[in-house]
Amino acid sequence: MNKENLTAYEVVTEENLTDIHSTGWLLRHKKTGARVMLIENDDENKVFNIAFRTPPKDSTGVAHILEHSVLCGSREFPLKDPFVELVKGSLNTFLNAMTYPDKTCYPVASCNDKDFQNLMHVYLDAVFYPNIYKREEIFRQEGWNYHLEQKEGPLKYNGVVYNEMKGAFSSPDEVLEREIMNHLFPDTTYGCESGGDPKNIPDLTYENFLNFHRTYYHPSNSYIYLYGNMDMEEKLAFLDEHYLSHFDYLDVDSVIQEQKAFGACRDVTLEYPVAENEGEEDNTYLSYNMVVGNAADSQMAMAFEVLDYALLSAPGAPLKQALLDVKAGKDVYGSYDDGILQPYFTVIAKGSNPDRKEEFVSVIRQVLGDIVKNGIDRKAVEAGINYFEFRYREADFSSYPKGLMYSLDILGDWLYEKGNPFAQVQQLTVFEKLKKAVNEGYFEELIRKYLLENPHGCIMTLVPKKGLAAQREKELEEKLEAYRSSLSEEQLDAMVEKTKALEAYQEAGEDPKALECIPMLKRSDIKREAAKIINEELTVDDSLFLYHDVCTNGIGYVDLMFKTDSIAPEQIPYLGLLKSVLGYVDTENYTYGELFNEINANTGGINCGVEVFDRADSTEEFQAMFSVRGKALYTKMDFLFKMIGEILNSSKLEDTKRLYEIVASVKSRAQVNLTGAGHSTAVLRAAAYSSPMAAFQDEMAGIGYYQFIEKLEKDFEQRKEETVEELCKLMKKILRPENFMISYTGERESLETVQKLAGAVKAGLGTEPVEKSEEKLTCTKKNEGFKTSGQVQYVAQTGNFKKKGLEYTGALEILKVILSYDYLWMNLRVKGGAYGCMSGFKRNGESYLVSYRDPHLKRTLDVYKGIPDYIRNFQTDEREMTKYIIGTISGKDVPRTPQMKGSVSKTAYFCGVTEEMLQKERDQILNASAEDIHALAEIIEAVLAADQICVVGSESKVAEASDVLMEVKPLINC
């Protein structure tokens, strides 16, 4: 890039970013003062992000509602929902927007130059010239509205963000996290809920909503980021000529103010709702929260990440273990939150009681005091440093673009204009400094200053209360009814008309001319060749060695797998438990704490899991593998396999005290996952009514598993010996040479070494005779409704079309896009107010429809029933069909990290998917027409005919739906 050509910009700084093999530029737009960062490199996955400082002054969620709303049409793209059109018709590798406590971000990414330019154009127009000033309906749809269908009917609140936040506030873990921040920074913007508190969202007026945009969405308050291999001069010229130069400088008062330190640590007690069947005992959250430094100190930030690891995250970590030993809670964990101006460190005991608070605080201070006096465990700190350095060097963010993650990290410094904004991508020097500081008392001093002698903190107690959800629901109904009753006939008529007007706006189709404004690619811009499967079938001592020859920059990815088809149905939940036990208990040569630290000090980690593969050609067959996954530099491969062997061959399961700690922690975290990902929970359970594979997964990781672990935790004292015995039997049954196979991703230079090491592991496996079970799980349709203390629903319906003699086709991938962003989006999200709606179709015929954070239940099931007619009447032109095809391919052509390439190829192997199948399906997608979509109506009818329904939702909504559900029961019983 030639600096002489940047006439509209002033170059603030230029840096050689050696850690990420890039050149960094910091610019300032001369006319507006807009801040611009460029990171130039050879990464084809290009990223654009424009962010604004958006500090809220209340908890009405204005920043969040605006984030949704600006993407609902703009000056150059006057559609109702250009965001959806982009999702449907671009080759994006990322497309979203995010609201944080003090900023709002609009990032996009694509590997296609033309597509990237289109995405950038639409997003810039959206943030600077949104249609929110022309259509109040946008605010009412995305934020909140009074919903009154007839004068005598019930008055309700609706709105996408309103329902999203009802779901967020249904999780006590999320409530605790939000309240900690609010109470640590009560006099700043962090004392407000940027996402919106459902009880405050209806206080937001349309005018205040518009004023927020006028105030903060200006180039002078913007942070613009470009990353990757592109013509930076061209992009900067576009930015200036089309947008920035059309504005004058504005002095925007958006500086984030620091909270003045407290004179003394504060004590806060709050309540949260639990369902009627849930116990209040052992359900309290205790938290110890301290403000630590500021966002500009990148070394301190990484040091506190390491302290979180050394004190709380690692098994046997001293603070965690001390709190568990005194039974301060059934699960103990911590976090370091640094995405705001003043980061904070938190210690949480979950599954506690209010009367344990004093001991909770006392133990924390005693343990930390002892560490300051006697020194921190050097090995634990060194392991923590290596843990974070390995991940920093690896830079594997799965399907998320690397440049996107760098952008979000950089904003953590850049937004506050303190320190070097490039510091987050120049961390290697920080790791070197921390390694030296281990022996210099640095970590002990941080503990003393910030965690022990710091008055700026709070002790928060979150106490469960039965009936609180029903009480709040009743109060809201009474409030709305009182308001409805206060209105005159004319006002009621006007409200009904306004409800109808919003529905009319939502039901109106897009203007064809407006649709043509959205730039899009052609089918010819899409590569026709399907991705290659990188599998070489080798052997090690007659066992399968599946090799994936991928450039991994010196890191080897190992997956040792053991077939589990010999286990009995009643052993499946123990398999789910075993993956949480191995690696977290003592072995012959290490305590569990030493084991964890040794592994993390020398490798990228080892973890156990269960991988389940469905056969593409069968509705019944599947393969479940117990897996031990690890990654390390090639030079550390021998150590990695040594530790894997240690875990597999010498783990000690008889320590029932440790076993109980694991069971209690698993239960605690499973509760969060069940409700936090309620859509996945409901889909898996509904599929389990007829699918052997789904039934297996449910017993091993779903509701069935949670019911097992819940009872086990409750009755552990009586069942501890039995549990040890079952786990030992299970290990003997599956960790055997005849069950062994391995998948390895790495460069060929490392292959021979890994084969030898794998052979040694196999040779050490047990061979004593065991009894193999031929019994299989049975599936039973139950159509369950699971009651929670939450305020929203997750409504799933599943079925298998192959069981009706129908075949899979690539066109189903297009149907998924059509349903998720047309029919379901319009009927469940736009009209119904649900935050999300999804569908999916697998090669073995398993299919699902599901809603996410949905205020409805029966209405949603009725929407599902309408899908076949919608498909039969589906009308589209060539341009729209091409858009759906591009959107479908976008989801399939996501750039893959080296680890992902190996994992995807391994999955294809065990699922029986060939390159020929992938190419055939891709051709079916690229050549699809409206007629191909019409033919899929029969498939949806087959899915719906299975009548498999599962709902996770509020007590009241689930109870009301007893006529469409066969069983209604609580999700959580204790």
Model-based region annotation:
Residues 1-47:
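Non-catalytic terminal extensions that flank enzyme cores
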Residues 40-42, 49-51, 162, 166, ...:
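His/Glu-based metal-binding/catalytic segments typifying zinc-dependent metallopeptidases
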Residues 94, 210-214, 273-276, 319, ...:
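Generic recognition of flexible, low-complexity loop/linker segments
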Residues 45-55, 81-129, 136-147, 174-199, ...:
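M16 family metallopeptidases and their MPP-like homologs
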Residues 147-221, 225-243, 247-275, 280-282, ...:
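Hydrophobic, small-residue-rich alpha-helical packing segments that form membrane-like cores
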Residues 62, 66-70, 578:
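Active-site His/Glu-centered metal-binding helix of metallohydrolases
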Residues 211, 223, 232-251, 374, ...:
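Extended, regular secondary-structure scaffolds
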Residues 158, 210-242, 702, 723-758, ...:
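Non-catalytic, conformational "gating/processing" segments within enzyme and secreted inhibitor domains
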